[in-house]
């Protein structure tokens, strides 16, 4: 892959990081800085909004410059712009389905193989955007193996989030692999917790250490 296109793909990956992390910050009231901004006041929400808007404008400039330099064609730039949104939609749809809370806990296998795949696993295939649409000479079998490995790695990252966010997900009725394990194997533990006052910062996993093994 020529150096100019490799550099373009790397820059696109940073934009995806801004979009994904910025959205997570808004959804989970977190403060992971991905684009340093000097804004008046201390509003974290508006900082994330501006970061996401800025990343969108940066994408336009990157693609326009890449076309002007002959790095990619106009058609390829259009494909990258369109796919940059489409790749984020499965995760967005899964997050949207949990905003009002889930009424029942699905099986741990379903959480692991379906929900975590949509929410996080597929996001780890984003670095292949340019390869999928432009680099047709690349070994497709090798790409498929790398994608599968990265999807599994992404699922592992989501499990770590589930451990950390057990209390938040319990209170807000969101999908969580460990909570689904408890619902299946130790429903009395979940019932007991439902009668106690919890905060999202509680380290609930300390009380059920076996569930993370």
Residue ranges and their predicted role:
Residues 21-43, 128-138, 151-211:
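Acidic, Mg2+-coordinating active-site segments of isoprenoid diphosphate-utilizing enzymes
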Residues 49-162, 167-170:
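All-alpha helical catalytic cores of prenyl diphosphate-utilizing isoprenoid enzymes
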Residues 1-38, 94-107:
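Conserved N-terminal diphosphate/IPP-binding helix and adjacent helical/loop segment
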Residues 11, 18, 44-54:
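Helix-rich alpha-solenoid scaffolding regions
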Residues 10-17, 80-83, 174-181:
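Short, mixed-charge, low-aromatic patches
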Residues 2-5, 44-45, 113:
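A short glycine/serine-rich beta->alpha loop
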Residues 71-77, 206-213:
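Transmembrane helix-loop-helix
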């Amino acid at each position: 892959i020529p150096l100019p296109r490799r550099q373009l793909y790397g820059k696109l990956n940073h934009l995806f990081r801004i979009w994904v992390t910025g959205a997570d910050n808004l959804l989970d009231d977190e403060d992971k800085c991905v684009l340093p901004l000097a804004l008046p006041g201390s509003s974290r929400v508006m900082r994330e909004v501006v970061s996401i808007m800025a990343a969108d404008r940066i994408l336009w400039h990157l693609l326009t410059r890449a076309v002007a330099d002959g790095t990619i064609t106009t058609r390829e730039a259009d494909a990258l712009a369109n796919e940059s949104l489409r790749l984020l939609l499965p995760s967005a749809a899964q997050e949207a389905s949990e905003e009002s809370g889930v009424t029942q806990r699905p099986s741990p296998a379903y959480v692991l193989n379906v929900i975590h795949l949509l929410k996080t696993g597929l996001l780890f295939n984003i670095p292949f955007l340019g390869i999928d649409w432009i680099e047709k000479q690349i070994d497709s079998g090798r790409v498929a193996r790398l994608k599968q490995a990265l999807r599994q790695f992404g699922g592992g990252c989501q499990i770590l989030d589930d451990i950390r966010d057990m209390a938040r997900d319990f209170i807000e009725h969101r999908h969580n692999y460990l909570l689904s394990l408890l619902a299946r194997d130790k429903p009395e533990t979940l019932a007991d917790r439902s009668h106690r006052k919890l905060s999202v910062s509680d380290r609930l996993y300390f009380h059920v250490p076996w569930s993370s093994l």
